[in-house]
Amino acid sequence: MSSMPIYEERLNVNYPFIGGIFLFALAVGLIPSIILGGLWWLTALYTALTIGIIVSFFQMRVELFEDKLIIKFGLFYRKVIEVEKMQDCSPYKMPHPMRTYGGWGIRKGRDGTFALTQAFVNEAIKLETPEKTFVISSRRPESFCSAIKSVKS
């Protein structure tokens, strides 16, 4: 395996979305603390959990090497797909991620696909393997598929 990826893409969540999530979680932690009086630990717990979730899903990173495709979400999730198992790749426009997958992130779709999607990125590739069909977010789906096809040939 070469150390440099043939194709690489980083998809970050937009900052207003993160700010909204953080403010919502802070309010959920702060309001009960104020009402119940002095439960500062509840606010600290919600804040820590929110920061952990944001760090875990802030960035989706896609790297294609000669022998494998690696998709990483934050610090904890990593999916490896061997190039030899890839059958077909095509650009794909997600019509409605909330309806099909119930949101963004790591999801199983109602249509049987396995989605690895980033918030507010509706362009993707559809990657077929013998076991599963993956939908992977990409801001440049044509380039991503071209890179996969060049590695396959």
Question: Language-model segments: what does each one mean?
Answer:
Residues M1-I34, L116-Q118, K126, P130-T133:
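N-terminal membrane-targeting/pre-transmembrane regions
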Residues F58, K72-V135:
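Non-transmembrane, membrane-adjacent beta-strand/coil modules in membrane-associated proteins
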Residues F134-S153:
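C-terminal/domain-terminus segments
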Residues L36-L45:
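Short, aromatic-rich membrane-interface segments at the entry and exit
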Residues P32-I35, V55-F57:
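Juxtamembrane cytosolic interface motif at the C-terminal end of transmembrane helices
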Residues L23-L30, A44-I54:
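Hydrophobic alpha-helical transmembrane segments of multipass integral membrane proteins
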Residues D67-K68, R78, A124, A147-S153:
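Generic alpha-helical hydrophobic packing signal
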Residues I51-K68, K72-F73:
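Transmembrane-cytosolic junction motif
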